[in-house]
């Protein structure tokens, strides 16, 4: 569980079954919706279901927010096969910041996942939750250059919101930082 993350507050009681997700996608397609985003916790704990949904709905595009720790060579090959699943790998900056918020070894696993994806020429991006402590780092040219070198095509930036039992108000960016 990541420091200050709201997703863990819900536990797994709100997880949808494969059939429920499939039904939502079918209903969405009837309405002209062909792009779907998986969020967490960690969506890749259900890799098998995600790949099956990608295969079944090959006319749709899927994006998943992930810490990247479950992307291995086999899963990267499956992504290459389906061609319609794009991960946004969560990093909080460089190693110290990412591991500090997401757990020791997370950064190394995320970088390894980026390597598997880049080797296969699979599109992926990064997802960053900016805080009072990491904003300077994740907005730096050095950070962008590193992520581009590792193959990232896009970046999502989310403003930290202190929500839930583990909220850390000191991580909230200052008004001056938010203007940056």
Model-derived features: positions:
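A short acidic, helix-capping loop that chelates divalent metal ions and anchors anionic groups
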Residues: 11, 95-101, 163-169
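Active-site donor-binding loop signature of nucleotide-sugar glycosyltransferases
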Residues: 7, 159-160
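Canonical Radical SAM [4Fe-4S] cluster-binding loop centered on the CxxxCxxC motif
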Residues: 1-19
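Radical SAM/AdoMet-radical enzyme domain recognition
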Residues: 18-38, 46-159
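Short, intrinsically disordered, charge-balanced linker/junction segments flanking boundaries
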Residues: 1, 148-153, 173-180
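A C-terminal junction/extension of Radical SAM enzymes
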Residues: 160-180
């Amino acid at each position: 569980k990541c420091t200050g993350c709201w997703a863990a507050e819900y536990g797994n009681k709100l997880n949808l079954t494969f059939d429920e997700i499939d039904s939502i996608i079918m209903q969405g397609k009837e309405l002209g919706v062909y792009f779907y985003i998986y969020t967490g916790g960690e969506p890749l704990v259900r890799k098998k279901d995600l790949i099956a949904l990608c295969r079944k709905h090959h006319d749709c595009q899927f994006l998943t927010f992930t810490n990247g720790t479950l992307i291995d060579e086999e899963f990267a090959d499956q992504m290459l096969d389906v061609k319609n699943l794009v991960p946004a790998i969560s990093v909080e900056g460089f190693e110290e910041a990412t591991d500090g918020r997401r757990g020791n070894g997370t950064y190394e696993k995320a970088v390894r996942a980026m390597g598997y994806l880049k080797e296969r020429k699979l599109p992926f991006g990064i997802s960053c939750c900016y805080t009072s402590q990491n904003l300077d780092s994740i907005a730096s040219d050095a950070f962008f250059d590193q992520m581009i070198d590792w193959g990232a095509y896009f970046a999502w930036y989310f403003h930290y919101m202190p929500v839930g039992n583990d909220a850390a108000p000191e991580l909230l960016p200052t008004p001056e930082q938010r203007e940056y």
